[in-house]
Every structure is written in structure tokens, then in C-alpha cells.
Design a protein with these regions (language model features):
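N-terminal "domain-start" segment
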Residues: 1-86
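Acidic, proline/glycine-rich low-complexity IDRs
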Residues: 94-146
Length: 146
């Protein structure tokens, strides 16, 4: 999703000692696959995940917005004025609209925690949501590190 690339580029360019990873993986669902196998197939490596339960769209949007708006402190993060800028707000609206679109197509949204095999290196924040839609799975994942 272009909105993920755009906001990650903005945060990575304007942050210090701070790297943002955002990705959306999509693939066919398998009725017989366990959660670890299904998510592992999406990210392309073995993973161990914790299922934190089903969530509603509002919870998804609140968590993603909170994570992406992380300011940090001296030495890491993004300057507060950048997170308050019109450019950031516009980029965040794009991500929120894309997340709403994913949620509208999903029969379920599950919050996950990737315990092993995370495709990035989470330090400051992380999120992972698995959307089940018809015959496919969509994993919306984000994290930040130093």
C-alpha cells in the first residue's frame, strides 16, 4: 500500500536513531493451517505468534494511529512538531483510510504479537493485525526500532 510506504519514508527521513517498518502481506487462506503456519507463509519465514484476540475496526485504528504518532525522547524518535505537521496528518489519514478499507472487507480482524521470526526488529512499538477476508488473509504489520 502506497500510504504505508509514504508515511514510513516520512518518519524514517525525519526521525533520529529511529526506523519504521510497515508492511501489508496478502495470501490465500487455508482452513487447515494453524496460525503460526498461516502467518509464516505470509511473511516468508517461520514465526511463532500469540493471538491476542479479535478486535473491532476502532481498536485497530486507535492502535495504529498511536504507534505512528510516537514521538520518542531526546536521542530517538521524531520531533514533536513533525508529528503535529499537516504533512504527517495527511499521511496518517491515508494510512487510516487504507486500514478502514481492509477492515471493511474482513470478516474478522485479529490482533497478534509475533514472538519469534518478526521480519523487522521491534523496539519502541509494534503492531500486527490479521484480516480474514473471503478466501484470503492479509497481515498488516508495523514496528519501529533504533
Amino acid at each position: 500500500m502506497r500510504s504505508l510506504e509514504d508515511i514510513a519514508e516520512f518518519l524514517n527521513t525525519n526521525g533520529w536513531n529511529y526506523t519504521v517498518f510497515l508492511m501489508c502481506y496478502e495470501g490465500p487462506s487455508s482452513l487447515h493451517a494453524d496460525l503460526d503456519s498461516a502467518v509464516g507463509r505470509l511473511v516468508g519465514s517461520e514465526v511463532v505468534v500469540e493471538d491476542l484476540g479479535q478486535v473491532e475496526e476502532a481498536e485497530l485504528l486507535a492502535e495504529v494511529a498511536s504507534c505512528l504518532s510516537f514521538v520518542g525522547s531526546d536521542g530517538e524518535g521524531v520531533e514533536p512538531q513533525l508529528v503535529e505537521s499537516g504533512e504527517f496528518r495527511s499521511l496518517l489519514i491515508g494510512v487510516m483510510n487504507d486500514a478502514k478499507h481492509l477492515a471493511s472487507r474482513a470478516s474478522t480482524i485479529r490482533r497478534l504479537r509475533i514472538l519469534e521470526g518478526h521480519p523487522a526488529y521491534p523496539v519502541f512499538w509494534e503492531f500486527a493485525f490479521l484480516f480474514t477476508a473471503s478466501s484470503k488473509l492479509i497481515l498488516f504489520i508495523g514496528s519501529s526500532s533504533d
